[in-house]
Amino acid sequence: MKIFDIIPLKSIVIVSLAFVFLGIPGEAKAQSTNGVTLHLDSKQQSMVTIASLTAKGDLENLEAALNGGLDAGLTINEIKEVMVHLYAYCGFPRSLRGLRTFIKVLDERKAKGIEDNPGAEASPIVDTRPKYDRGKENLETLVQRKLDGPKADYAQFAPVIEVFLKEHLFADIFERDVLNYQQRELVTVSVLTTIGDVEPMLRSHMNICLIQGFTPGQLEKLLQVLEKNVDESKIKSAREVLNELIQSKD
């Protein structure tokens, strides 16, 4: 069952209005129907595919996806940043193998006389506040609410993991402006869907996608892109998570 089989029109309208008022840039606005964005552009789809194949360790198909992403206009640094970002969700081994595959692809393209755009480097971090405070603020920006309540059970049980999440993931990684928050969340949802069996985290990041301006239709499109390379059972589970999330907002 796909999302538009169950989502009331009201839900789509609400999300669409949120999209407008948040002032999301044009890169997130591909094709639309009655003002509701239903698709992802070619760069976004390439990011989804590259992230998924890297997380899966499907290096043969990753080579083709990397070529496709570069041809679609992704810069070298944007693709590198996708692979740096996803290690936080699927581990260093997958990320490093993906980066080595990317090196191979770039060498082959260079040998063919193809000059790819390196793109922008990450801007220097000038905020001198403690990384924990910066990471907490970045996370609050992502979820659009204050996070001053009781800590989650895992944070109480193993406090250091919560410190790592704030200081490393949401400060060290999310502060890097090679990718914006939308792109990072798109990559995150792609990876979580691909690895499977992490439904609570997948729901949280799908919700952040909606908060950051993606529409239900765009998240459905993400799942359609992933259907080409991800097990049917994982896509079904992710679609159920998305449908339940949308229903909970009515």
Q: Each predicted region: which residue ranges?
A:
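Bacterial N-terminal signal peptides
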Residues: 12-24
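Acidic, glycine/proline-rich low-complexity segments that act as flexible tails and inter-domain linkers
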Residues: 26-43, 55-72, 77-78, 92-181, ...
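Substrate/cofactor-recognition hotspot
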Residues: 81, 85, 90-93
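An amphipathic alpha-helical core segment
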Residues: 192, 207, 211-212
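Bacterial N-terminal signal peptides that target proteins for export
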Residues: 1-14
